[in-house]
Each structure stands twice: as C-alpha cells, then as structure tokens.
C-alpha cells in the first residue's frame, strides 16, 4: 500500500484521528476527503510517509516553505525526505519514525543516514554551510551514545551542521 499512501499524501493535508484510529488525507482546500486509512491497514513504510507529511505540515504551520522529496520520489529521494526554507535559511531533513518506544537505531543505521546525507548534500553545497536535521518522534529511539556519535560528525568538512530534532506524533 506504500506507494498509494505516499501518492495520496502528496495531494492533500494529513489529519490523524486518534480516537477512531484513522488517518485521513483531506483536499488542500479542506472541502473533501481524498482517502482514509485504518491504522491496522498501514505498514511501517506507510507510517514513515505519514510521519514525513506530519513533520512537513508542522514546519508549514511555522511559515516555512516545504518540499516533500520523500513523498514524490520514494526510495529515490537520495536520503532526504524534506527540504524546508524561510527567508535565507534552509534545512535538509531526514525523518525516521518507529512505533517502538525503545532504542531501535544501531550504529550502522546512523552511518547509513550520514552516508546518504553526505552524498545528497555534496551536490547542494555552494559555499554556504548547510543544515541537516535527523527528525524523530522521540530521542528514546536512539541510544545516547549513538546520538553523540551522530553529533560528533557535526560540521563535517565544515560544510554541514547536523542536528537531532524531535517532533512527536501522537497515535
């Protein structure tokens, strides 16, 4: 169902009904529902796309322009899900979602995220420091030493500033 969910998310606004355990995609005008999904029908990849849209909408509410690379390109997004910009600020974001409440990120996953980010960002660099954020619903997903490992790579080649951000998505 993943491709179908991502396609529908790119067409409208996300609404999550926690009481009914339903995810709705509403038209951008808010006049009608494009699609609705029961929680039980969604797999982990679907939830990943839903989280990307949720994070993007949070930044839209803060006045950022949001480009949804993950929703439009899927696994070909180059390791970057969202690009946000406002005035002369820009950040490249990788979103990672899990329904687990405990650490589930290993060092290999962090290295993979950094590898993909460096490949993508090297093509974006134009003599101005770039911002790369790893956004998760809770830092509990990443053990403290792996958070420190991620941040120890900060300012790699003095071109990119790394940050860990949390944006909770209640279910």
Language-model segments: which ranges?
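Mixed-charge (Asp/Glu-Lys/Arg
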Residues: 1-171
